[in-house]
Amino acid sequence: GKEITNDKAMKTLKGPLDSKVKIGVLRYGSDKIKEFTITRGNVVQHSVTSAFMINDTTGFIKIRNFGENTYPEFLSALAMLSTKNTENLVIDLRDNTGGLLQAVALMANEFLEKDQLIVYTQGRKAKREDIRADGRGAYKKIPLVVLINEISASASEIFAGAIQDNDRGIIIGRRSYGKGLVQRQLSFTDGSLLRLTVS
């Protein structure tokens, strides 16, 4: 075959829903290309990758990133664990590189009392904006542990920081990445985007 860039390969693979694309695979040790026809579809990446009981009283939720569906997925996981009489909760943010500020704020709100600070943003020329809990969270009393590591960054650090700063739970793990930034995403007509750090 001929060599193409990753960008060209991605553009070739993407297409209308339910349309077909033919790909060839050359396996290591073989000189024959094996062809496959693939039907294009929506690829859904879940933020909540697991939710289960560790023991009779402790629930566990692993969150890979903070995206548009994180909060509804998180609420579903909490509801499922609640049916199993969860008395304690472990939230695993290890290897979570962050995501949407709105998703992390909604999630933290579930555990904090009214007016407790979740996060504030402040730029060099922008005035400080506080995001506070509204007090309507359903899990304000459940004992909470948050797991982090050196890859936990951005929104993960905001969640862990809100829990720690409000003495709401215990943070366990390694020092996090250190990227407590807020970025705005600007989309351009050619499909490219720019992530601009604003605070």
Model-derived segments and spans:
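Short, intrinsically disordered, charge-balanced linker/junction segments flanking boundaries
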Residues: L196-S199
